[in-house]
Amino acid sequence: MLSSSFERNLHQPLLFIDKDTRVVIQGIGNQGQYHSRLMREYGTKVVGAVHPKKAGKIIAGLPIFKNMKEVVKRTDANASLIFVPAPGAAAACIEAAEAGMGLVVCITEHIPQHDMIKVKKVMKETGCQLIGPNCPGLIQPGTHTKLGIIPTNIFRNGKIGIVSRSGTLTYEAAYATTQAGLGQSTVVGIGGDPFAGQLHTDVIKRFAADPQTEGIILIGEIGGTSEEDAAEWIAKTKLTQEKPVVAFIAGATAPPGKRMGHAGAIVSGGKGTAEGKYKALEAAGVRIARHPGNMGKFIFEEMKRLGKI
């Protein structure tokens, strides 16, 4: 039987987070402590952390709880940020979902793919939204809320939604849209692993429904079909007639069979190429930026073309 906290926490904001998001940290080591402090300085409501051997203590200004069920009961948390090392990260994701979290953001890299299959099954069963793993997290400048390791100084409240498989290219797009005076509504780093919790289409659907988001930047990588699937949805809904979309795909020069950075960034069997992704996106009406330095310029031009600025 579902707990009342589970039922309550399923009612998550359209763009995953808002000013009322209450965050618990799983994995309060050096990185967890450091980034939880930065999140609180930015304005995020971080309400506690979980460590089974340190329950009852205060670490980095946060009360420590034995497990996720206890922290939900005591703090009314509705989102979890995971810094647990790879061997235990999948179990941490599952514990968070089963405790009633509406959102789990997993920063951890190198989680075994077999473990992630189990995690995705639990997420589907519980209705919990997973972002990551192997991702920088997400940020919402208008509410001063972020979960993850994203640096805050380049972000400004504004009109552009950014969804990206690459952390550093996310920051490039954010800086460019800030410099162009457009700012960002919400920025989501979905991560580069083969079994990601959110794919491009999942996030773009939310941007399409969000009134503050007036334009979208999609940053992809070689490998997988997330970008092609997004192109299909964009074409079917004629999204670019209402909200412009600009896309950049990383890894265009990668030789077949060579992994480029992320575990999912690999071309195999002739599928997952940058050119194939560009072709699908362009056919859907998406403006293609073949150099990351053009992302800000092109979204500004597209916004102007549609009379949004």
Curated annotation (Swiss-Prot):
Pathways per UniProt: Carbohydrate metabolism; tricarboxylic acid cycle; succinate from succinyl-CoA (ligase route): step 1/1
EC number(s) reported in the record: 6.2.1.5
Q: Where is the transit peptide?
A: 1-9
Please tell me where substrate binds in this chain: Y171
InterPro entries attached to this UniProt entry: Cit_synth/succinyl-CoA_lig_AS, Citrt_syn/SCS-alpha_CS, CoA-bd, CoA_lig_alpha, NAD(P)-bd_dom_sf, SUCC_ACL_C, Succinyl-CoA_synth-like
What is the enzyme's class at the highest EC level? ligase
What GO CC terms are in its UniProt record? hydrogenosome lumen; mitochondrion; succinate-CoA ligase complex (ADP-forming)
- What does the entry list as the binding residues for CoA? K54, I107, T108, E109
What subcellular compartments does it reside in?
Hydrogenosome lumen
Q: Give the signal peptide as a residue range, or say none if absent.
A: none
Protein family according to the UniProt entry: Belongs to the succinate/malate CoA ligase alpha subunit family.
**What is the name of this protein?**
Succinate--CoA ligase [ADP-forming] subunit alpha-2, mitochondrial
Give the organism, scientific name.
Trichomonas vaginalis
Encoding gene per record? ALPHA-SCS2
